[in-house]
Amino acid sequence: MRSPSLLLVIVCLLSVSGVSFGQSHPERIRVILDTDANNELDDQHAIAYLLFNGDVFDVEAITVNRTRAGGGVDQHLAEAQRVVRLCGLDTKIPVLLGADKSFEEIRGQLDQGDFDGAEAVNFIIERAQAADDRRLVLLPVGKLTNIALALAKDPSIIPQVRVVWLGSNYPKRGEYNKENDVPSLNYILETEVEFEIATVRYGQPSGTDAVRATLDEIRQIMPGKGPKVSPPVTGRHGGEFSTFGDYSVSLFQNIRLHGDPPSRALFDMAAVAIVKNPDWATAVPMPAPILRDGQWTERPDNPRKIVLWENFDRKAIMADFYDRMQHYQLASPPPEVRRTQP
C-alpha cells in the first residue's frame, strides 16, 4: 500500500506553487555536457534531464572523462552511451571520449594529434568556434580536465564559452570532482573565461547536496517514464530496460542511500537545472579564489570575478525534473554535428 504521506510529497513536488515548467526561452541554449557518467547515479539523471529539455537546450554533445570511481574511461563512455540510447537519441547526440589522465599529465602533449582526450577536447574547440551568435555553455559535472585542456590548447575560445561547473564544497575543503584534478581548476581560475561554480557542500542545505530523491519517490514516479526504445538496453547492474525511467529505478536500487528518509543527491542534475532556470538558485559574484594545499585562498583584490551558485530550490528543481520525465521534449544538436553511432 502506498504511504499517504509519500503521495502527498509527490503531489506537492509536481504542483509546487511558483514553478513554471514552461518558462519562456527566446532561443535555445547551446550546451556540451562533460561527465564522468559511470560514477554513482547523478550523472545519468543529468544526461536524461538535459536531453528531455529539447525546447530549452541545443545539446551539441556529451563528452566523458574518467574520475577515480566508475572504472576506466571506456566504462564512463559506455554508461553515457547507454543513457543516450535510453533517451532515444543515440543516432543524433554525439558521445565523445575525453581525458583518462589529469590536466598536468596531458597538457604537454596537446601538440600531438592523438593526445589523451583529443576527441572531446577538439570537438569542444570546434563547437566554440562555430558561427553562432549564441555562446556555448560548457557544463562539466565531473573533473575539469577536458575543459581546461580545451582552453589551454586554444585560448581564443575563451570569449566564446561559459563554463558552469558542478563541484567544490567552497569555502570548505574537499569534494570529489575538485579533488580529481585540482590543477585543472586552478588553471581555469587564472584564465578570463566566464566561470560559475554550482556548489556541492556535502551535508549542507545550501549546496546541490540538498537536491535529493528518495528511493520511494523514484519507485512511484519513474517507472515507464521517457520514450520507449527498442531493442532494450542492458543496464550497468544487469537487466534489460526500454525506458530511462525504469533504468532510474535500477540505479537507485543498486546504490547505497543516505539520510532519513534514505535518499541520494542529484548534484549534476541540479547544475543543469540552474542553467535552464537561474531563479532556482542564488548567484553570488565574487573575486576568484585559488586552491593552495587543499585550502581555498581568498583574493579579495582580484579583478577576475567568478559566480558561486548556492541555495538551490529543491522543490522547484525536483518538480521540474519529474515533470520532464513525463512530458519530455527530446533535444537535438545542430545538423552539422549529428551523426550515427554504433
Regions found by a protein language model. Give the residues of each.
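Positively charged n-region of N-terminal signal peptides that target proteins for export
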Residues: M1-S5
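Bacterial N-terminal signal peptides
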Residues: L7-S17
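N-terminal acidic, glycine/proline-rich low-complexity segments
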Residues: Q23-P342
